[in-house]
């Protein structure tokens, strides 16, 4: 696999066993660019195809006047977690439960929640929905923008319920989001799961351009 969003996590977990040799083969380069580390760089990263963005287009969409849609995808260490908007939001609990009801044992919300908590280093108050000791730093987005606050209030006035935590007990409604930013820098899966273990695990190798 490559060193994308999932590949970095997979490599971390597999290489924890010193008897296993793991090699990530990544088509892109290392995540050294300031534009990747700087959260404000997202606009430039997703705008055009380049060294960090594959720049895909979808197939023509019949119900969108046969338009092809721009589909930026990360290229390099961290994959799309190195170019995305850094919003941290999990799948809806009901979706996981529907998977379980369809016969996918072990994939109900109660089954996957412990793994979400294990991976998460939440900077807010840890509870049954959030973990505080994991490598993926998650923080609440500060309500320091007039536009941000007004958008939430407008949603409430339109009849949507307020939810303070989209990854908590109530996942439907309008409210502040959480983000993967650590001390002012983007916290991709490469920063969280790959970089911290590379020096100490001789059984883990990354091949990239």
Where are these regions (language model features)?
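N-terminal redox-cofactor-binding region of secreted/periplasmic oxidoreductases
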Residues: 1-209
């Amino acid at each position: 696999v490559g060193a994308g969003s999932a590949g970095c996590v997979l490599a971390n977990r597999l290489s924890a066993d010193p008897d296993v040799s793991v090699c990530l083969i990544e088509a892109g380069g290392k995540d050294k660019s300031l534009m990747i580390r700087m959260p404000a760089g997202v606009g430039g990263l997703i705008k055009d195809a380049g060294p960090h963005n594959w720049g895909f287009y979808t197939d023509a969409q019949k119900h969108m006047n046969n338009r092809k849609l721009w589909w930026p995808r990360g290229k390099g260490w961290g994959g799309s977690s190195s170019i995305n908007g850094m919003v941290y939001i999990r799948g809806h609990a009901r979706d996981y439960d529907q998977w379980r009801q369809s016969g996918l044992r072990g994939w109900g919300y109660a089954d996957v929640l412990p793994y979400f908590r294990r991976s998460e280093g939440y900077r807010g108050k840890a509870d049954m929905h959030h973990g505080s000791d994991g490598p993926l730093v998650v923080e609440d987005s500060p309500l320091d923008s007039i536009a941000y606050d007004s958008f939430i209030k407008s949603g409430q006035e339109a009849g949507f319920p307020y939810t303070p935590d989209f990854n908590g007990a109530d996942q439907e409604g309008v409210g502040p989001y959480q983000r993967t930013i650590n001390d002012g820098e983007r916290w991709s899966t490469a920063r969280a799961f790959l970089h911290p273990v590379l020096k100490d695990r001789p059984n883990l190798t990354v091949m990239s351009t």
